[in-house]
Design a protein with these regions (language model features):
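Rossmann-fold dinucleotide-binding core
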Residues: 124-216
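NAD(P)-dependent Rossmann-like dehydrogenase/reductase catalytic/cofactor-binding core
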Residues: 2-6, 11-18, 236-353
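Glycine-rich adenosine-cofactor-binding loop
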Residues: 30-49
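Glycine/serine-rich phosphate-binding loop and adjoining beta1-alpha1 elements at the start
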Residues: 1-32, 175, 195-202
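Residues at the starts of beta-strands that form the adenosine-phosphate
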Residues: 32, 54-58, 146
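Active-site-proximal catalytic alpha-helix in oxidoreductases
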Residues: 181-236, 242-260
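Rossmann-like NAD(P)-binding element
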Residues: 65, 73-132, 140-155
């Protein structure tokens, strides 16, 4: 591990320079990795491992709403009956079981997977949800297996895309149960094999608490909510849809957030007008102080398991997928995002095509 300074706090991280792909391949040479689920993360992680020379088997159902994922696996070169099986058949094989189904799917499939585990196997997660909220999920591994986690800091699409362009994506990793004594090596090897650039140590609990808070907060929920609030305010005061969208979303995604990505928030502020900078610095404090109680409430609901209860209740409902489709359709058909589609079509780079 190397020690790095994060805002004055020293943390130790794993680099792929010290823990190379070759080392990961050696450690995994006698392992057979079974990916249970070929969704967004399952596909990306499985393809990256296959490309890195790891033996991988896919478990994916092929009927109903599962069919597109099975068909995609076949398109990607997985062969039915050879390295592509149903979930139940795949679960019987391998030494490292990657549990990459949805959280609700993990609950449903766990009794089957648990009965296939052999002494010394490893159960691999990319989210601490099922383990930390075991009282609600029922996912309790036996004592004679390793329980490990690698959580990429991005979507499966980014995991695969970054792997293909050679950049990789950072991930956090954790060991919840080390029966064999080699769980640390296993989890690091898996992290590098799926294409991680750096591996950050964490715990299952810290991973799931921060992940659920982030998704409901700045990364998705708060981002969408505050965008809608500003857009609606501008529209209510007579601004056109294009103007409201440009000042709410387009300038952020096409300019400002790229400056933050390059060199930090202060860099972005330094590269804005004086008027923008003075106002933003003043209102930053008001937004921070105004939203902190909301974030505290959110974190409390995550920590107590209330958010988990809601997720499981909604995802198990028979009409869940239809309600989800309706909600996303409503969002996509809102004036704001229909205006956004037109604005995006007018970007110069698209006009050149």
């Amino acid at each position: 591990m190397v020690e790095l300074d994060f805002g004055g706090v020293k943390e130790r991280v794993i680099t792929r320079q010290e823990f190379t792909v070759e080392k990961a391949r050696r450690l995994l040479k006698n392992e057979v990795v079974v990916s249970l689920g070929y969704g967004i993360q399952g596909r990306a992680q499985s393809l990256n491992m296959r490309d890195n020379g790891v033996k991988v088997i896919i478990g994916q159902e092929k009927t109903g709403f599962h069919a597109p994922y099975f068909d995609l696996a076949v398109e990607d070169g997985w062969v039915p009956g050879e390295n592509l099986f149903s979930l139940k058949e795949a679960a019987k094989q391998g030494t490292i079981k990657m549990f990459l189904l949805t959280d609700a799917g993990q609950m449903e499939m766990w009794p089957v997977v648990k009965n296939t585990l052999k002494e010394g196997d490893a159960v691999y997660f990319s989210h601490g949800f099922s383990i930390i909220y075991r009282d609600q999920t029922g996912v309790v591994p036996p004592n004679n297996v390793d329980v490990i986690l690698v959580a990429p800091k991005g979507s499966g699409t980014s995991v695969r895309r970054n792997f293909l362009d050679g950049s990789g994506i950072n991930s956090s990793f954790a060991v919840n149960q080390n029966y064999t004594g080699k769980a640390e090596d296993r989890v690091k090897a898996m992290g590098i094999a799926i294409g991680s650039g750096y591996l950050f140590p964490t715990t299952f609990e810290k991973e799931v608490f921060s992940d659920l808070t982030g998704e409901r907060g700045v990364l998705m929920g708060a981002l969408a909510g505050i965008m809608e609030a500003q857009y609606n305010t501008l529209r209510a005061h007579g601004h056109s849809p294009s103007e409201a969208f440009n000042e709410t979303v387009e300038e952020l995604t096409q300019s400002l957030i790229r400056l933050v990505d390059e060199n930090g928030m202060d860099w972005m502020y330094r590269n804005c007008s004086e008027t923008a900078r003075i106002g933003a610095l003043r209102w930053r404090n008001r937004f921070r102080d105004g939203t902190t109680p909301l974030f505290e409430s959110l974190y409390e609901l995550v920590a107590t398991g209330e958010e988990t209860r809601i997720v499981l209740e909604k995802s198990k409902a028979k009409d869940y997928r239809q309600k989800l489709a309706d909600e996303l359709k409503e969002m996509g058909n809102s004036e704001m995002w229909r205006a956004g589609a037109t604005v995006r079509s007018l970007r110069p780079k698209r006009q050149k095509q």
